[in-house]
């Protein structure tokens, strides 16, 4: 059609003022517009999917990259489970939701693409036409003194979006090659620019691991992409 579709994160909970950092549950919300510049109209009656008790997405079912593949839309959404008992650790992964109607409900795969132990969230996909390989960029969550933070951008690759292998991954950005932000590397988003792949990400100068006062970083990978040997 001629409408732009947006899936965005919503939550009824935040940290106290003034920061108001979103907190669980993370939900997938829907809006649409006739132009990417807006105005955007929220669609509260459209519920793509929600966290479900007893599943790998019982705490988080938040939006991710959407791609049309073999006649249906796949959304690579962020999923998580939080332990019931202290210290109430959080386990994160990526799941696939499917639909043929972007304004309708989605069905969620019974298992994530990789185990919860991977501790990843957020997605951005790139398809390398040279060898028909899909690359999924995501961020890894680490814990320091009980505080969680995104410490690296990882990439997974596959030739079939329905089949993933957790061993087929590599570190793209972390403290070893991102010197301006020695601790925080999060929310990678990729875009082809000429013969390079641009990677936008957020970071924070200094030794803090705060959610606030972050900057946007830019890195590049040469194209075509090739899995490391």
Model-derived regions, located:
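Carbohydrate-active catalytic/glycan-binding domains of CAZyme proteins
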Residues: 1-229
């Amino acid at each position: 059609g001629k409408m732009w579709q947006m899936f965005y994160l919503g939550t009824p909970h935040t940290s106290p003022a003034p920061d108001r950092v979103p907190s669980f549950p993370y939900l997938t919300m829907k809006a649409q517009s006739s132009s990417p510049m807006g105005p955007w109209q929220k669609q509260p009656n459209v519920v793509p999917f929600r966290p479900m008790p007893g599943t790998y997405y019982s705490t988080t079912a938040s939006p991710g990259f959407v791609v049309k593949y073999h006649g249906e839309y796949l959304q690579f959404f962020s999923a998580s489970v939080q332990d019931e008992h202290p210290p109430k650790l959080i386990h994160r992964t990526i799941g696939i939701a499917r639909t043929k109607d972007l304004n309708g409900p989605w069905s969620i795969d019974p298992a994530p693409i990789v185990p919860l132990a991977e501790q990843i969230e957020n997605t951005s996909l790139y398809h390398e036409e040279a060898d028909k390989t899909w690359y999924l960029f995501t961020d890894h969550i680490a814990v320091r003194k009980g505080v969680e933070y995104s410490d690296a951008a990882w990439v997974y690759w596959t030739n079939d979006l329905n089949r993933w292998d957790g061993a087929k991954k590599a570190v793209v950005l972390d403290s070893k090659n991102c010197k301006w932000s020695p601790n925080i590397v999060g929310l990678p988003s990729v875009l082809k620019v000429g013969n390079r792949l641009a990677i936008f990400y957020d970071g924070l100068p200094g030794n803090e691991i705060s959610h606030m006062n972050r900057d946007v970083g830019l890195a590049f990978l040469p194209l075509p992409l090739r899995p490391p040997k």
